[in-house]
């Protein structure tokens, strides 16, 4: 009898263990079926899966009160996701293509797993504001903008490190709001579009319906043609009558925007020129907080007392308003804790000031990184703050490259475009030079724009722009942050020297830590400082193929292992010889390895990152 009892106990333990190992996934993947599927390319599909998983988390949270599936179900959840993708992309491997790791699907922000844990971190006033602003249909622009703006108040309380890129701290507010602040739930059309950038798919048509569509289309085309002809005759007559009347140049008429509205997907607020004049005290010089080649930046206050920044562009013409409108619309749709939020815009023609083009952004309290490194501020930044700024810059740029749709290449990353909030969280700003990367292209030729010392060699020489052009600029800014030396300085002989060449000369001689500013407060461990220097040198390598991607940079900076990607030998200083650059532009792999006093090993990534057998320098 005792023997049988022992067998029963062993059998129970074994079956329980097996059940835990093969726990079914609690996420309901059928929820994603009504939503439009992506085009068959890696970047778009990965973004769809990322946002789709977040919508599933929200649906799961609404049903169970838990944000994430249990860790023991991670494998089955990935298998279920793979099965759902196989229906429209049969050869697409979710984890290997998108870089997802198995545990990430059950890991989130600051170990938060339940609704009560999340709400305990956020002030009741912020939760109440979100419940009020988000509890409506979010299909149109105004309620969506109001809802997402209220969610930004959650971010200061969700600043912990994220273990993966599936459900990070930046995404938790949207997951929570869709589940509980909005009574319609995450699967509602407006909620999914506003908070997860997912559109419902159009219903499929049968053969008979297609015929009806063709007939209807022809009828609409015929009617439209008649209307166009009628409108043309009306326009000609109206234009002729206007020539016989004196021009009306009143201020009210002049301040009308050339663009009356934006598209349905934008969350921008359109300000009148008079509103902005009032907010900036008629563009008073005392309100100027920044100057640049594209115009001045003014501080001001909105009617509700909110402090904002107004960037006023120079030398504008109404003819460029369409491109301007498209650019700000795309920028406004990109939301991340390390990107400066765009609140609104203004386009107007006035009788005295001429054509105006202005964007309205959040005002940050600690100025720019340039102010703290090279401005009048005397206090040195301590290492913990510099480390936070470096990580924030990297995460913001990585999101522009791989989280935004379409991906955005900034083109003008520099210290003055890295703004710092009250917690010294970095905000990547100034998208005036942003260039949108067309799907399927590895590079594009464009008019070179940027700032001396920060522009990548292949871009400066040939105008060929890729995400790795931004990586180069990031490396230069990171070196400035570590050394407190400007991008371009003069040596003892009065010759210009780039900070990248100066840093490389020290690293090559085994003096890596000499790059770090003397007397830095709260200086970190030598091995950590050395890792950051080597990452900066790698990013600012003159050869394109040698640089990592921003995703790889984030992983290296966040890693507790003191490893770094292999660094190839650099060619001649500042800008490599044209033959080397030519080869670099058309190449996607390189080799080389850097030894260091603390004994770094090569940190290799799959994909397009540099790796392989190396030559020690």
Swiss-Prot record:
Q: Does the keyword rRNA-binding apply?
A: no
Which SMART domains does this entry report, sorted A to Z?
S_TKc
Q: Where in the sequence is the signal peptide annotated? A: 1-20
Please list the disulfide bridges.
none
The active site consists of 412
One GO MF annotation is: protein serine/threonine kinase activity
- Transmembrane helix: present as a keyword of the record? yes
Report domain Protein kinase positions: 283-563
Q: Which reaction does it catalyse?
A: L-seryl-[protein] + ATP = O-phospho-L-seryl-[protein] + ADP + H(+); L-threonyl-[protein] + ATP = O-phospho-L-threonyl-[protein] + ADP + H(+)
Question: What is this protein's tissue specificity according to the annotation?
Answer: Expressed in the whole plant at low levels.
- Cytoplasmic topological domain ranges are 234-617
User: What are the binding positions for ATP in this chain?
Assistant: 289-297, 311
Glycosylated positions are 22, 124, 135, 165
Q: What ranges are annotated Extracellular (topological domains)? A: 21-212
Q: Which Enzyme Commission numbers does its entry carry?
A: 2.7.11.1
What does the entry list under GO cellular component? plasma membrane
Membrane topology per record: Single-pass type I membrane protein
Q: Which superkingdom is the protein from?
A: Eukaryota
Q: Which UniProt keywords apply?
A: ATP-binding, Cell membrane, Glycoprotein, Kinase, Membrane, Nucleotide-binding, Receptor, Serine/threonine-protein kinase, Signal, Transferase, Transmembrane, Transmembrane helix
Q: Where, subcellularly, is it found?
A: Cell membrane
Q: Where is this region: Disordered?
A: 585-617
> Belongs to which family?
Belongs to the protein kinase superfamily. Ser/Thr protein kinase family.
PANTHER family under this entry?
A: OS01G0750732 PROTEIN, OS05G0423500 PROTEIN
- Entry protein name: Probable LRR receptor-like serine/threonine-protein kinase RKF3
The protein's organism comes out as Arabidopsis thaliana (Mouse-ear cress)
